[in-house]
Amino acid sequence: MAERSAIEWTDATFNPWWGCERVSPACAHCYADTWARRYGHDLWTPDRSRRFFGDAHWRIPLKLNRSAEAAGSPLKVFCASMADVFEAHPELDEPRQRLWSLIEATPWLCWQLLTKRPENVAEMVPWGDPWPQNVWIGVSIENTAFTFRADLLRELPATVRFISAEPVLASLFSPARRRRPLRLEGIHWVIAGGESGPRCRATNVEWLRELRGACVSNGVAFFLKQLGGHPDKRGHEKAVLDGIRWTELPAFPSPASLTEVAA
């Protein structure tokens, strides 16, 4: 676990395990696979075992929770950068239950759960309506073939529902046969970005502009992570769109404010 993350839209990352099966075009140049292979791990097919961690690893979020409570300020935790928590892999039932218990034990951590498998979420989480206030749920959407994930996301009673449009591989608003434009009703936050890395696919800046415009029109927080492989990218301007650096975050309650309301 990284107690402090280099990912701009979170504070820390926690991976209950490593590995998952690729399920869509966004997975083609998976950075997590590349990273794992550096350490000799081949984890990205359904027949491979996942990589698991010991008790010391699982205690780190408890330490972070104590620090956040002492500071009176919640911390955002991205889960998982090296896996998909909602993958239906036979080895994952037990560690997934351990994760739910950990989330419930750390109310000062805002758990940012990002998945490409929203169809599995309702069955796998142990909570009814409402969910714990510190659970955020997000889906990855790279083109209009996967805008259905936003429809499934809207059905989930999370404090924050978000979309990760990174990498953006096409317009998310141009209708095509059997595909629907993205709708942002019921969504609180959008993270957008082009693909990075040596084999990155180019992102048209117009796709990012129309996504930003839709967020502004719908009152959705917009966070631009990077332009990625777009030819207009210039060093420090990698996350600047039309002269503005977009780093908006969604509104969310802290445990302290919830306690005050209950009192």
Region annotations inferred by a language model:
Residues 57-223:
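Conserved AdoMet/S-adenosylmethionine-binding subsite of the radical SAM
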Residues 1-76, 84:
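N-terminal [4Fe-4S]-dependent radical SAM core
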Residues 1-18, 22, 39-42, 175-263:
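Auxiliary Fe-S-binding modules of radical SAM enzymes
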Residues 49, 64, 170, 253-258:
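A generic alpha-helix propensity feature with a strong bias for hydrophobic helices
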Residues 4, 10, 48, 75-76, ...:
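Homeobox/homeodomain signature
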Residues 40-43, 48-50, 55, 127, ...:
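Generic structural signal for short, solvent-exposed loop/turn connectors between secondary structure elements
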Residues 6, 50-53, 118-119, 151, ...:
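Small/flexible residues
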Residues 31, 94-96, 154, 239, ...:
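General N-terminal targeting signals
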